[in-house]
Amino acid sequence: AKTVGVISEDPQRGLVKWAKPVGVVGAVCPSTNPAATPVNKAMMSLKGGNAVIIAPSPAGAATTRRTVELMREELKKSGHPEDLVQLLPSPVSKEMTQEMMNQVDLAVVTGSQNNVQRAMQSGTVTIGVGAGNAPVIIDSTADLDDAAEKICASKIFDNSTSCSSENAIVILDDVYEDAIAALERAGGWRCSEEEREQVRNTLWQGGKLNRHVIAKPAPVFAEIMGLAKDAASRKFFMVEEPSVGGKHTFADEKLSLALTVYRARDFNEAKAIVRAILDVTGKGHSTGIHTKNMDHARELAAETDVVRVLVNQAHTFGNGGGFNNSLPFTLSMAGGTWAGNTLCDNLNYKCFINLTHLVTTIPEDKPSEEELFGPYWERYGK
């Protein structure tokens, strides 16, 4: 799609649209995605004719630095100014990132809600995106092996650090054991009650996620958690919970290969569990369902405060705009006002341009009073 100059002309409506750059974009990027997110934000910024300054997380700064070096090399190779893509100098600090957000024309923030709030308080126009914590339902009509394979592929991508990774699954009672068996065939490990408590006590320490265990590959995760020897050969780890807890419980975002499993008596309870999980973390972001019953999918969409409800998809890949769905490609998913965001969409190139509308007159098409008020008058009288 064209994003600079005249991008559309509609003579019948007397409307011509020009796309213009927003200016300098400040892109705050998370430690959990220190390479792909900077590239994604730089691509969208450049497509609108902007320059971008990337603020890395201190924990991911080395990876982001190398990523920016590679982008600058490609810009130079293609005859464009390298400084269209810049990086805050090391060592990066909160104060430096804050000053960048104060001075740019548009701040685009992926990361903690604290980062989003600081950007919004800077006085700069800000696009923030919501926290993930995706719960996914497996209902009684689902193709269990297909669902399990998709959940596995999505869960293990980047060791489950994606905001769109399945953090919990809710399985209907009448297919519960069959679904667990399918997940085991796909590569899952079913933790014992003792192992579940070991995972719980290791994953959260001091009231927060233990940074030493998140984003670890499966063999390392199994060893750190003290799981049975055979667990080291598995791909992800299922912990079964009887109810939804609060923050710093298995209902929260885990950024690891731990997958919480809930059992629901029926579909109504499954929907209630999903809403309870999102109330802990992730409201506005997304949920999903594996089903052959589209009425169930539509019910979930109607009754859940999220921007995205994916049907029969690997959540990590579909949420960001897969080749088999119509969502815009992105690595940053806004959550609407439910998540405190101004955007209710996937972050995409349209967010990085301003539009000028050239408006000329057209033949008047003025509605009559009857057209405007007729249905009201018919029902309630004049």
Give residue spans per PLM region.
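Rossmann-like NAD(P) dinucleotide-binding subdomain of oxidoreductase/dehydrogenase enzymes
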Residues: V4-D146
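Structural motif
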Residues: G23-A27, M43-M44, N50-I53, D83-Q86, ...
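ALDH superfamily catalytic-core signature
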Residues: V39-N40, M44-G48, R66, V116-G245
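Electropositive phosphate-/nucleotide-binding environments in soluble metabolic enzymes
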Residues: A61, R65, K94, Q113, ...
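Hydrophobic alpha-helical scaffolding
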Residues: S90, D105-L106, I137, T141, ...
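Short, surface-exposed amphipathic charged segments that create phosphate/polyanion-binding patches used
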Residues: M100-Q103, D143, L203-R211, F250, ...
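Conserved C-terminal structural/oligomerization subdomain of aldehyde/semialdehyde dehydrogenase
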Residues: L227-K382
